[in-house]
């Protein structure tokens, strides 16, 4: 029998048989999007985020966690410069390895992981270079179409900027794995939500930075996951990610209409995570204990148990009752006792 839920998590990611199926759910802790971007510059905000995530663990006792990057969303060079034209993307430059965005981030995540006392494993949210620039334009400029204009006008400028960001994200991820105690990163990616941007353009100018980042981090520790984000109904071509160098895959099964079992086959048998719709319309948010536990058992009966982690499609609503997550763990673990 595995020693604890931390070891069970690693065994699950390795696709080994386990005596339990683990479940984990997460939500953001800052409702102010600008604080999610700029919060790292205020130690009081950092301390508050750490305390909230520690309290979440104490209150819910999850089987594993995906630690949120609230307050540290974006690279400083993405935040501090103005980008009127694609030419301005040359302003994106690497930062020192001891920049506060890195050192404060590592210290904050270490404080959260230390709080688990080795009982569970954890991933940490990292936004891909594409996602970072997109969020910068959406959050700080309220211009969600700007990144698509830049990509159409000067794709190589985009690719060059992403390559620089990937280098610093490799530094950050390496320090997090080696110093904070996380098992791996949870890289958030999403394909362009613009029909004018071709798959070939995405593959040539966006994808390389993501593959470079993941390949380097996998060399540090082989337990990293990719999150193919379907937040608010965004669709992705899941098969385009099947050759990414990662241990496990997570996608919005309700949005993409691809079950865990189907995804596991698509991704050549690697570990997968998901199962529950994460919106206010889903059973996880509004269901009774009986309904949530019935859905948990259905998910495992239809998708199998080996190499599977149960979670939401993405972040759950702020006001979700933490008891709901405990109900899933109870049903998932109870279903496997003695099997």
Show the residue positions of the predicted features.
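A contiguous, low-structure linker/loop signature
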Residues: 67-98, 111-114, 119
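Glycine-/proline-rich flexible loop or hinge segments
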Residues: 32-43, 48-49, 86-97
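Active-site loop segments of alpha/beta catalytic cores
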Residues: 1-30, 37-40, 52, 63-67, ...
């Amino acid at each position: 029998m595995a020693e604890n839920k931390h070891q069970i998590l690693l065994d699950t990611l390795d696709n080994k048989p386990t005596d339990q199926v683990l479940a984990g759910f997460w939500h953001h802790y800052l409702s102010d999007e600008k604080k999610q971007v700029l919060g790292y510059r205020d130690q009081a905000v950092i301390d508050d985020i750490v305390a909230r995530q520690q309290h979440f663990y104490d209150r819910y006792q999850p089987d594993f966690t995906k630690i949120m990057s609230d307050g540290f969303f974006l690279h400083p060079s993405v935040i501090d410069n103005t980008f009127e034209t694609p030419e301005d993307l040359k302003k994106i430059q690497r930062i020192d390895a001891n920049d506060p965005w890195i050192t404060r981030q590592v210290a904050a995540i270490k404080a959260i992981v230390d709080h688990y006392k080795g009982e569970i494993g954890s991933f940490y949210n990292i936004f891909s270079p594409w996602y970072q620039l997109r969020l910068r334009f959406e959050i700080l400029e309220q211009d969600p179409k700007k990144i698509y204009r830049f990509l159409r006008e000067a794709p190589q400028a985009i690719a060059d900027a992403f390559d620089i960001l990937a280098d610093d994200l490799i530094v950050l991820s390496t320090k997090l794995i080696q110093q904070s105690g996380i098992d791996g990163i949870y890289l958030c990616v999403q394909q362009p939500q613009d029909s004018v941007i071709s798959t070939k353009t995405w593959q040539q100018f966006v994808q390389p930075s993501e593959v470079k980042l993941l390949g380097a981090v996998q060399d540090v520790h082989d337990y990293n996951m990719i999150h193919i984000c379907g937040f608010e109904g965004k669709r992705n071509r899941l098969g385009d990610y099947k050759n990414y160098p990662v241990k496990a895959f997570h996608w919005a099964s309700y949005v993409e209409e691809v079950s865990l079992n189907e995804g596991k086959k698509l991704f050549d048998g690697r570990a997968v995570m998901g199962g529950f719709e994460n919106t206010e319309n889903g059973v996880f948010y509004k269901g009774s204990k009986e309904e949530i536990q019935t859905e948990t058992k259905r998910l495992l009966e239809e998708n199998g148990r080996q190499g599977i982690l149960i979670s939401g499609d993405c972040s759950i609503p702020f006001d979700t009752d933490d008891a709901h997550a405990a109900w899933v763990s109870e049903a998932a673990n109870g279903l496997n006792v003695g099997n």
